[in-house]
Amino acid sequence: MKEKLIELVEKEYLRSDIPQFKAGDTIGVYYKVKEGNKERVQLFEGVVIRVNGGGVAKTFTVRKVTAGIGVERIIPVNSPNIDRIEVLKVGRVRRSKLYYLRGLSAKKARIKEIVK
């Protein structure tokens, strides 16, 4: 009974407009940013290094390298601050968590792409 009630409440907050992606894919996350009374959309583009959790609590971590510095952002999938997500490249990896990319240089951190 309790699980059904939780599922019913969670169903309202699940988003259906999010595409399927996995670790190794390069994605662009268009994130809504509020600055004072203005709101704008900011692009965060990088490689998904981790997908964690499920349901409403599902999150993913995106990593990009900017000016030689690695930047990671943990983003909730069902966040209302996400405008949209685009899958730019589908990567071919054999791991579900790509933490080893943190220690690699830019050229070695490249991921093979699946060509369709």
From Swiss-Prot:
UniProt-listed PROSITE patterns: RIBOSOMAL_L19
Domain of life: Bacteria
One of the GO biological process terms: translation
InterPro entries tied to this protein: Ribosomal_bL19, Ribosomal_bL19_CS, Ribosomal_bL19_sf, Translation_prot_SH3-like_sf
UniProt keyword terms in alphabetical order: Ribonucleoprotein, Ribosomal protein
Gene Ontology CC terms, in alphabetical order: cytosolic large ribosomal subunit
Protein's job: This protein is located at the 30S-50S ribosomal subunit interface and may play a role in the structure and function of the aminoacyl-tRNA binding site.
Name assigned to this protein: Large ribosomal subunit protein bL19
Organism ancestry: Bacteria, Fusobacteriati, Fusobacteriota, Fusobacteriia, Fusobacteriales
